[in-house]
């Protein structure tokens, strides 16, 4: 796990039982809990995010959540940033703990591991810069119809600056241009599922209680947010976890 991300998600050495973090989470929401955890680190000169983060506990929790929700014969798409500031050995250990037998990866900006390690690549049925999936039930009144949905680590190219302005330049070549299709993405660590346009859904862990998102949940979200309006609420963006 990324040290800053692990701290923001409540996996810390100074609150190992999540007591204070969870109390804030339940009473004031995730943003308040994140701000508290980050503040503890920044206010203590003896700490930094690497010292404060319990990255092993973070990774164990993510693996446990996936195994609890995703079946052996399901298709699991991981939309990037699978491993960062960790060894490929640890990455492979986490992936091998997943009971799902059909793993697919979309490459994120922290995924250099796939270039150099064939055994890690072999754990996936596919690894692509961007991909598509056929999902059922997204259209209103067409419960059996399938629809092609784009899969990317990044929001649409036109929306990169909506969160972190530098992304519009840094990741322009990697992000897909808007083509009218719905998009599932990660990358932003925002706390809400809403994208910068109604066709985009953030399926990152921070917006979904650190749990994978099912096809049914995706369909339900798009049904609940079906609109012709061009207005989108401002995204609740955290500080960037780093380059």
Q: Predicted regions: what is each one?
A:
Residues 121-242:
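Conserved beta-sheet core of the metallophosphoesterase superfamily
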Residues 4-139:
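Core catalytic region of metal-dependent phosphoesterases/phosphodiesterases
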Residues 2-6, 85-88, 112-116, 159-160, ...:
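Short catalytic/ligand-binding loop motif for oxyanion handling, primarily in non-cytosolic enzymes
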Residues 1, 81, 187:
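Conserved acidic functional residues
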């Amino acid at each position: 796990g990324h040290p800053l991300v692990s701290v923001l998600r409540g996996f810390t050495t100074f609150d190992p039982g999540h007591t204070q973090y969870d109390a804030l989470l339940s009473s004031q929401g995730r943003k308040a809990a994140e701000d508290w955890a980050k503040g503890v680190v920044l206010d203590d000169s003896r700490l930094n995010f690497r010292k404060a983060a319990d990255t092993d506990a973070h990774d164990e929790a993510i693996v446990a959540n996936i195994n609890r929700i995703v079946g052996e014969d399901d298709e699991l798409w991981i939309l990037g940033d699978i491993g960062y500031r960790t060894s490929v050995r640890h990455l492979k250990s986490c992936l091998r703990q997943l009971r799902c037998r059909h793993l697919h990866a979309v490459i994120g900006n922290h995924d250099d591991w796939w270039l150099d390690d064939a055994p890690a690549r072999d754990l996936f049925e596919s690894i692509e810069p961007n991909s598509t999936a056929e999902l059922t039930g997204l259209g209103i009144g067409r419960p059996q119809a399938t629809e092609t949905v784009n899969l990317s680590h990044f929001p649409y190219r036109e929306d990169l600056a909506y969160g972190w302005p530098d992304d519009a330049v840094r990741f322009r070549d990697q992000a897909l241009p808007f083509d009218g299709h719905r998009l599932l993405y990660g990358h932003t660590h925002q706390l809400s599922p809403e994208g910068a346009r109604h066709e985009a859904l953030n399926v990152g862990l921070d917006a979904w209680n650190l749990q994978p998102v099912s096809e049914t949940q995706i369909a339900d979200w798009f049904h609940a947010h079906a609109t012709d309006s061009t207005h989108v609420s401002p995204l609740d963006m955290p500080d960037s976890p780093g380059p």
